[in-house]
Amino acid sequence: SYSNEMSVVADTIGGIDVAEAFHILHMDKRWTGKPAAMSTYVYPGCGYGGYCLPKDTNALYAVTKTAGFDAQILKNVIATNDHMPEFIADKIFRHIGDNKEQTIGILGLSFKPGSDDVRDTPSAKIVRELNRRGYNNIIGYDPVAIDEFKRKYTDLTISYVTSLDEVTTKADSLVITTAWPEFKDIDKKVNKPVVDCRYMN
């Protein structure tokens, strides 16, 4: 949540390379070794997702508040992550403008790479926010999670393609929402706007 908030801060202030800032942070020797593989958690993205982290954070906050303590960090962790889809939709708008006829390609549907788990995935929240703003020409691609996403999120206006080549060809702009390795350097391979919400490139 801190890293996501820092991406908003960097974007708001301007002139800050948030990816470089976090690469420098990760050079601290206290982040190395086992079991301290924390660098993947302390990096900006689309907000948390998956089954455990959102549920457990909300539960911990609720239990703590019921017990009489309004835990501000937990409260702000929830608020920051809940705000990310709106922030990312604003970022997409700044890159592609108000042309709602253009096709937006969503790169990644699972909540993390290496998994087909789409529970509480940021991709669904971002697509929902884009739909709410009138962007309905959306195509999604994921190496493994298309079927799961399609089954779970029937309320979204989105179609699907089965290859990276197809989404990069059909879309007018691309949005990276899951850090799959195959999306690395996609901005150098296509001549169209790429909104890198995972700060891979």
Residue spans for each PLM region:
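Structural/interface elements that position substrates and couple domains in central-metabolism enzymes
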Residues: 1-201
